[in-house]
Amino acid sequence: MKYLLIILFFSTILLSQTKPIQGSVIDEKGEPLFNVNIVSKPSNTGTQSDDKGVFIFEIPIHDQQIILDHIGYEQETLNAILFKNGTRVTLMQKVVELKPLDVTGAGREQFSPFETKNSVIILDTEELAVRGFVDIGDALFSEQSIVMNETMNGQKSISVRASAPEEMIYLYDGIRINTLGDPLLDLSIFSASGFSGIELVKGGHEKALSSSGIINFIPKLTYGSSASFTQQFGTYNYGGFDGFGSIGSSLVSLNGGIGEGQFSQIYIDAEKPEITTSHQRQFGHLGIKNRYNLEFRFMGFKNGKQFQNYRTGNSVSIDMENIIGKMIHSSPIGGEIIFFGLLQNNLGIESTNSYTINKEDLNNGFGFSFEKPIRSAMAKFNGETNYLTSNWDIDSLTFITKRVNSIFTGSFELVQPERNQGIQLKDVKIVLSKHLISDTPDSSFDEIMDTETWDESSSMFTGSIVSIMSQKRIMLYTNLGNVFRLPSLNERFSNHIRSTNQGTIGLIPEYKNQFEMGIKIENENDNEKPYYAINISGFNYHYSNKIKQIQLTGVPIQFPINYGEASLSGFDSNLSFSSKTKWFNFSSSYAYYLFSDPMAFQLQPDKMVRNKITLKIRWFQLDLIQRSESARQITSINSTGTFLDNRLDAIQTYDANLSLKLKFREYKGTISISGKNLNNESQVLNGISLFDQRYNLNLGLSWK
């Protein structure tokens, strides 16, 4: 406490090291421009011009640049040191084809592809919608070097860097949503509709220290009026639609959408599909902001799914509801504070020949985030608490458990202002986190699963060096961490109920020591020059008490055990290139892993490749995708208690998409034809053909 008071005292002194900036923005005709984004670098202090084109804010005295950016106008960069108050800045209009449906405003993206000390990939959901992916899981699997696992009951989950799917953290506008009894988020119930972007982060991060991967869904929140509709048709009874509409102004926005879809799967010895899946989606977003850096967001979605396997008799029904309220206040001199509330309700029925489970999860959560620049430093504090009640009926047994889950994270980062050239230390950061969990089962459940309390601490250190050359930036970064993962309620239930060996009953936290080092290279994104970006990272993870899933043979049932010590080393890379006129684009994603024990990392290939070529010629766009994976292994156990090692063969597939985009005034129409797995090389799991050959027709129409 004494040191905290000292830090706060000096912070108050340092915060006064600012200077006022005042000016105005006009166009070539001398008319004022409002809602122009003005950002001071490197502190990222920002504001917007008002309806008279005037902007007033304070910036740290060490800032060097003031950047003015507005849709449809050339970006202007001014010298912050030489800037004279009262300056009138003229922005020149440019002719560009804008993305009409959504502009991701300041603060919407949670991660920077270059600045974040991780591998960060941002997916364009408008492009994903055009190409007619079945769901978000299908899109991520096609685009990136990640593993998608699909159970016999149609649940789709992904893993990054050979980690367990339970490690993944899913965010909705920066708020974690996989906080229920089962941390696996079924990606088959999400489509690209409703999102303006998707961020994929590989490796541990301050927002999720124990995870090897993060996915952040950026919800659409268009401050303006727009609408869109897409319709899909395809083989194996694939079809669906998504509709979106938005009304609003520069200060208020209300939008929403609905969607439905269905598809089928086939057994390799069958002539027609025997597995069907249908899903429904609804979402709504409300945004209210003023001209003083205050914004309120209210977001909600309700997704449902019905799965039926007519051969086995297995069926699944899911209804997932989420409501999020968020208040964001950004300071004109840098930093921001966020408060949020979360309400979740999840209903699920899973029926097989072996059992029937009715799941009802109700979660109420709240939290905050606070960050403040302190001269050449940044202090951040984050906290969240979730109150979860799980009411599960398993055959004739009823289990009611309450879990209180609290996380508090603090970080302190020293930031060196970037010079125009040369090699320099960019930043160093230390992150400390405290995680508290308390499980309290119903009294009738005590003899099956006891009360448990965990109090664990994690830490991480990050640092980076940057080199700025002519038209190019290079960053070297490293991450060191000692983190943990606590068992979910679903893992604890499954372990107690389904373990076949008395010695494996009871789960303890999984610990992980992690090390990562990487390099990022990118050139200046100039319309007059080709653009490229390279990201290569190597890492090592060492697990203690690793939690591993065991599959029961012939039924869609898994249960976890603590496997013991295991380690993983590897590297992944991402390369992207765009020609000068953007008619040719190439991206490549590659991953290679070394396992101390392959059976400790279920269904994980040791090599993955994704290559994509995009050609844009006038109204036409052609996408060619090649992807390959090495063989995968999984451990199962039969009715006699014997462990069996199973294998999925290596796979290499080719996809293609041809689209036609036409624009007339404020309307845009799209027609695309997609073919997946054109070489018809599929994998087989439990007799079901995975990633089989499919053809889709997609139609889209949008306004503004």
Model-derived features with residue positions:
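Outer-membrane beta-barrel domain signature, especially the mid-to-C-terminal portions
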Residues: 273-276, 314, 347-350, 440-443, ...
